[in-house]
């Protein structure tokens, strides 16, 4: 099980480690945070495949928070990966940037994410639900919801691949009841972060690794 977690590089420095500075230098060099972390994770993955005690046909990779991005990249690049754990909410990344534009107290329109999420040219071709959908029919579990609109897109890919049962979707407990969740096709512009998260069914204080969902799922898919 390869785990990709936010700021895992130099994690001995804890949350004081400034990932944004590293991201800036990587961008200046023609790289990106996503490109660098995906490259490093690929080295680990290739090493694992060389170990006699690891089943190469049952490798599962797990992404938590920012780590879901290199998880998606590894899945696209390496067809040997058996299954995926997506421990974050699923969103359309371009849409998030377009709608989270409410000016702050200094009348600036802040960018919705840190520079760590900046991937030059990415938005011209890709959206996160599209990339995840390309992983079909390999098993995947989503543990922290998002809009059912985006889950329907992923589910359609798994259905088309003949393995609809290989995609498992969970929402935050706060939004587990369908009657409580928002189910919209389009978001209004001018949202602040709090309103955006509420609209896409995200409960930030409950953002943690959902082992209570992942462990039973792993037992099922690794039989």
PLM features: residue spans?
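Short, small-residue-biased leader/transition segments that mark boundaries at the very start
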Residues: 1-8
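Alpha/beta-hydrolase active-site loop
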Residues: 12-52
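Mobile cap/lid helix-loop segments that gate and shape the active-site cleft of serine hydrolases
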Residues: 20-29, 36, 82-132, 137, ...
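Alpha/beta-hydrolase fold nucleophile elbow
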Residues: 53-65
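Short glycine-enriched nucleophile-adjacent loop
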Residues: 68-79
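Catalytic His-Asp charge-relay segment
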Residues: 137-144, 167-170
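Conserved alpha/beta-hydrolase "acid-adjacent" motif
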Residues: 143-152
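C-terminal catalytic histidine-bearing segment of alpha/beta-hydrolase fold enzymes
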Residues: 160-223
């Amino acid at each position: 099980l390869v785990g990709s977690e936010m700021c895992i590089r130099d994690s001995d420095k804890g949350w004081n480690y400034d990932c944004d500075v590293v991201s800036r230098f990587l961008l200046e060099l023609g790289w990106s945070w996503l490109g660098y972390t995906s490259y490093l994770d690929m080295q680990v993955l290739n090493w694992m495949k060389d170990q006699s005690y690891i089943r190469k046909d049952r490798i599962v990779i797990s992404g938590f928070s920012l780590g879901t991005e290199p998880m998606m990249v590894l899945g696209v690049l390496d067809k040997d990966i058996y299954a995926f754990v997506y421990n974050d909410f699923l969103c359309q990344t371009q849409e998030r940037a377009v709608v989270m534009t409410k000016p702050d107290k200094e009348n600036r329109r802040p960018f919705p994410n840190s520079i760590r999420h900046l991937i030059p040219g990415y938005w011209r071709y890709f959206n996160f639900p599209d990339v995840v959908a390309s992983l079909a029919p390999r098993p995947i579990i989503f543990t922290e919801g998002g809009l059912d609109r985006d889950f329907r897109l992923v589910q359609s890919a798994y259905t088309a691949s003949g393995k609809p049962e290989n995609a498992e979707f969970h929402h935050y407990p706060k939004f587990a009841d369908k009657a409580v969740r928002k189910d919209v096709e389009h978001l209004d512009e001018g949202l602040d972060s709090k309103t955006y998260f509420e609209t896409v069914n995200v409960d930030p204080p409950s953002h943690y690794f959902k082992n209570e969902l992942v462990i039973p799922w792993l037992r099922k898919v690794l039989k």
